[in-house]
């Protein structure tokens, strides 16, 4: 565990007072089961605690970061951030995969690279950090490790581009956004609409769809993908 302690100190300025607690956070059930006579604790209870504090802190962040997003969108984004694959990625970023104690069978079967095990260890670490320090230290760690990727948009599943474009453009105040139909083609029962989105009278994106609403979404998507620099 000394190497892990060095990583935590050098990269995150974290020093555990309770070294046994830290070791437990990285002990998988398979390792504990293979050493039953030693009565070694595994990390499942810490995982339970870490999951709870992670949900709380990510929820708080999203609530404050996106004041106009509805509950459903916030829940979807949170689910993307705290899902197994995402947490496993964060664990690898922190080099946690190197320090998990696994049983021999689990090790041979590739457990060290398994997202489930890595994600669980990441949550267990958060639980241990909460017990050894406090929620403020957990928040500091999350903001250092997780939030930069969230703010880079790695977990966004954008379905409402009109709302997303509006949020991007109105960060610093109200901006006049308007959608207008450029053309309509095809028979009445099968029309195709071409729409452009304008900001302060300037066209910043165009889209096409079989309804005005779909075409507007495509126009907004086109504007978002161009980047904000082209919108102002």
Curated annotation (Swiss-Prot):
Pfam families: dsrm, Ribonucleas_3_3
PROSITE patterns: DS_RBD, RNASE_3_1, RNASE_3_2
GO CC field: cytosol
Domain RNase III per the UniProt entry, residue ranges: 5-134
Annotated Gene3D superfamilies: 3.30.160.20, Ribonuclease III domain
InterPro entries per UniProt: dsRBD_dom, RNase_III, RNase_III_dom, RNase_III_sf
Top enzyme class: hydrolase
Domain of life: Bacteria
Keywords assigned: Cytoplasm, Endonuclease, Hydrolase, Magnesium, Metal-binding, mRNA processing, Nuclease, RNA-binding, rRNA processing, rRNA-binding, tRNA processing
Catalytic residues in the record: 51, 123
Cofactor(s) needed for function: Mg(2+)
The EC number(s) this enzyme carries: 3.1.26.3
GO BP: mRNA processing; regulation of gene expression; RNA processing; rRNA processing; tRNA processing
Domain (DRBM) ranges: 160-229
Gene Ontology molecular function: double-stranded RNA binding; metal ion binding; ribonuclease III activity; rRNA binding
Family: Belongs to the ribonuclease III family.
Entries under NCBIfam families matching the protein: RNaseIII
Quaternary data: Homodimer.
Designated name of the protein: Ribonuclease 3
Originating species: Streptococcus pneumoniae (strain ATCC BAA-255 / R6)
Record lineage: Bacteria, Bacillati, Bacillota, Bacilli, Lactobacillales
This protein's encoding gene: rnc
């Amino acid at each position: 565990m000394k190497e892990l302690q060095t990583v935590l100190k050098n990269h995150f300025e974290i020093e555990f007072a309770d070294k046994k607690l830290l070791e437990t956070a990285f002990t998988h059930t398979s390792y504990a089961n293979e050493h039953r006579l030693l009565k070694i604790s595994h990390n499942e209870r810490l995982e339970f605690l870490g999951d709870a504090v992670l949900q709380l802190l990510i929820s708080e962040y999203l609530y404050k970061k996106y004041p106009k997003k509805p509950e459903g969108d916030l829940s979807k984004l949170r689910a993307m951030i705290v899902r197994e694959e995402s947490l496993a990625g964060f664990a690898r970023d922190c080099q946690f995969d190197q320090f998990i104690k696994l049983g021999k069978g689990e090790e041979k079967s590739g457990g060290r690279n398994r997202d489930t095990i890595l994600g669980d260890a990441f949550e267990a670490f958060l639980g241990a950090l909460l017990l050894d320090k406090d929620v403020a230290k957990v928040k500091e760690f999350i903001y250092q490790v997780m939030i930069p990727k969230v703010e880079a948009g790695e977990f966004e599943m954008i379905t409402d581009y009109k709302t997303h474009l509006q949020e991007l453009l109105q960060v610093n105040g109200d901006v006049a956004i308007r959608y207008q139909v450029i053309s309509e083609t095809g028979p009445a029962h099968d029309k195709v609409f071409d729409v452009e989105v304008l900001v302060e009278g300037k066209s910043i994106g165009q889209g096409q769809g079989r309804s005005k609403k779909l075409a507007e979404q495509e126009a907004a998507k086109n504007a978002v993908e161009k980047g904000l620099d082209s919108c102002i």
